[in-house]
Amino acid sequence: MKEIGPAWIDEYYLTFDYYSSSREAGAANLKLLASGMAATPGALFEIDEETLEALDRKEGHPNPKYYQRKIVTAYTADGKAHQAYTYIHYATENNFHPPSQEYEALIRNGLNRLELTTNWLDDALGNSMNAKFEHVFVYGTLMKGMPRHSEMQDGCTLVCEGTVQGDLYQISDYPGLVVGSGTVQGELYRASDMFQIIQRLDWIEGAGGANPLFNRVIQEVTTEQGQVWAYAYHYAKPTDSLEKIISGDWLSFNE
């Protein structure tokens, strides 16, 4: 088993609604809520078939009394989407079973090692839902001084400037970010209601559906205030015929 690194799963939140008889305490689980309302940080690993079989045995898959193996999308720091297995127990009741101190420490130490927030863990331990995935990174026409910036003024507050890893291309009168080795300049915003904001931004960016123009991903943003994970929109079409913006800066490209 090889660790790839920190990653996020969108739409799911951490909970302790499963009682583990072997641990004699609660065990971590995931529950589906909605994009913009929940997300869960963790670690992404590359595994082989032998390891997968061992994990299935450990988690009790496919016995419905225990955890079920499910394919989800995990996003790494560069915004790349990975199809990954995770294990979810589909509890029929909204129970809360506190974990042991050792089990909690195991999760917390893992998050700290990967420099990931423990807010969602703390909420799960308190059986509450106060944590928010509240940041979005923009790098084109939604930035200050650009034609669609007004869309960010309703419900979003500028936090600071930032950069993400990737390559930037000129699509038309707007740019597109793709996974790459370059650095792309942009702005980080905090949303007052991310669920509502992404409904609007998804429509603007043509995200979702069977033939999207952009895909909304989760990506790590580098700022003067530190590293922040945020939603960002990646161009979903081929870039072979497009001009690459070497500077990674849409504002300076348009001066």
Question: Language-model features: where?
Answer:
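A glycine-rich, hydrophobic/aromatic-adjacent loop/helix-cap motif
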Residues: 1-255
